[in-house]
């Protein structure tokens, strides 16, 4: 990639229909884990106007009121009015869960007498990434796209911008100079609003646009990056119908939003609703943990990790490190350090990151990575010092 370029990432709010589905799926996973952390869960959710469908495969000894969990999640997000097209009190909730396939279970449960050699729950490839563009070691475009929709929700919920509704999308286009963030070229923010905020079908009131720019955007983005920034606020002019009424929502449809905003490849596996025996989730978290510690150790300015697995086999097929020429030692040597300092077998990951806990609903909006939440063990940099010492730095 050229040293001077534009790069764009997007995020969506907790009220976006796909994110509503993700949060319900992870709320159900958490509810199950509170009673039975050894459960096997693959909880999928569909949301539409006045309707939630819960389906998937769950094997558990827990007794969970799935319908109530879905309603509570919808209420927390803010869909508490029939005018929004879905209301936690009155929406229909259909439940159609089955148990995990015995064919899968035998590969995961009985791969070895050594529990650390328990096999992966599926084949697949996963990526982790970190870079020095932000203190959180995340790419700047996705990091700030998340913060914009997070602030939209905050101002909606605390009443400072009471005309906002739950659905919103953000997009940040960053200008890079010499390969580093230089300024923000364009910010797009589309936020659902009450009908009386629309002047016409094609034009928003100036006061609404000003409020969004001054109260949501400018407090979030670094002032020095807002040089000649273009602001596109509700470009269609009207955003009243949104959430599950505006679009059908599905679990696992925002995988780029959930990860790095397109700054690195994605293996294709979604996260929400999956217990950590599913390497789609746990190995992606571990790969972020590895990449972040490598950058925090000063071994590279940016780092991409790829891991891959076969179903029923514990050890990854490959662990590949790519630093795009920013590494202070060869990538092959960094990869050898990864093998030495991180246990990337599924059970090893679960132990290393303490993943058999009800911590997942919080991950399901505003990004799984780059957030300093105490539950997000994959964001720790506790291996950085050991990596640096082992590299001889």
From Swiss-Prot:
Compartmental location: Cytoplasm
GO annotation terms (biological process): one-carbon metabolic process; S-adenosylmethionine biosynthetic process
Entry's Gene Ontology cellular component terms: cytoplasm
Pfam families: S-AdoMet_synt_C (PF02773), S-AdoMet_synt_M (PF02772), S-AdoMet_synt_N (PF00438)
List of residues binding K(+): 44
Protein purpose: Catalyzes the formation of S-adenosylmethionine (AdoMet) from methionine and ATP. The overall synthetic reaction is composed of two sequential steps, AdoMet formation and the subsequent tripolyphosphate hydrolysis which occurs prior to release of AdoMet from the enzyme.
PANTHER family the record matches: S-ADENOSYLMETHIONINE SYNTHETASE
Protein name: S-adenosylmethionine synthase
Organism: Paracidovorax citrulli (strain AAC00-1) (Acidovorax citrulli)
